[in-house]
Design a protein with these regions (language model features):
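A conserved beta-turn-beta hairpin within the catalytic core of GNAT-like acetyltransferases
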Residues: 90-98, 108
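Acyl-donor-binding surface of acyltransferase catalytic domains
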Residues: 1-17, 160
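Conserved beta-hairpin
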Residues: 60-61, 66-86
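Short amphipathic alpha-helix that is part of the acyltransferase structural core
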Residues: 10-49
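Conserved GNAT acetyl-CoA-binding A-motif
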Residues: 124-135
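Conserved acetyl-CoA-binding loop-helix of GNAT-fold acetyltransferases
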Residues: 100-103, 109-126, 143-148
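A secondary-structure capping/hinge motif
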Residues: 153-156
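Conserved beta-strand-loop-alpha-helix junction that forms the acyl-donor binding cleft
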Residues: 133-147, 159-165
Length: 165
């Protein structure tokens, strides 16, 4: 996958909307926890009653130590917080799989997720890997975003959920 990412384009975005994009580490967990909570409730969790802070902290800590996560951060009223994130959720021989892509609702449609993913794609390319991802069939905004980033649809997939009775 070709990626014509230029850091000057990202800096232009960062100057315009007062955010910066960074590669995250475990030290960033406290800044990311609320964004991870919103992501999991909107995109991942089937039964919201079963989700709790211990699970969110565990999943985020594991991702920050075993995967690659980039986020867009913003300072507002003297407080730093994450507005968007994108990361890998699987790393194979030839491909890194993107996952956990999420942007706070009030920051959507500003190309923030686009630039966060571009940072991630640049990192993936620097590792000599290609990128792949899955997207829900009805998630048209995400499909448009990924198409604008150069992704092409290669097939359909389904998720089966199992629950112990």
């Amino acid at each position: 996958m070709e990626n014509d990412f230029s850091s000057s384009a990202c800096l232009e975005l960062e100057d315009r909307i007062d955010v910066f994009v960074k590669k995250c580490s475990l030290e960033d967990k406290n800044f990311l926890i609320e964004l991870e909570r919103k992501y999991r409730l909107e995109e991942v969790v089937i039964n919201q009653k079963e989700e709790d802070d211990k699970i969110i902290h565990f999943v985020l800590s594991k991702a920050l130590t075993t995967q690659c996560i980039f986020c867009a951060m913003k300072i507002e009223n003297g407080k730093l917080f994450a507005v968007a994130k994108a990361g890998t959720n699987a790393q194979g021989k030839n491909y890194f799989q993107l996952g956990g892509v999420f942007c706070r609702e009030e920051f959507r449609n500003r190309r923030i997720a686009f630039f966060v993913i571009q940072h991630l794609l640049q990192f993936i390319h620097s590792c000599g890997k290609k990128a792949s991802l899955f997207v829900k069939v009805k998630n048209e905004p995400a499909k448009k975003l990924y198409k604008n980033l150069g992704f092409t649809e290669t097939g359909k997939y389904g998720i089966s959920y199992f629950q112990k009775q």
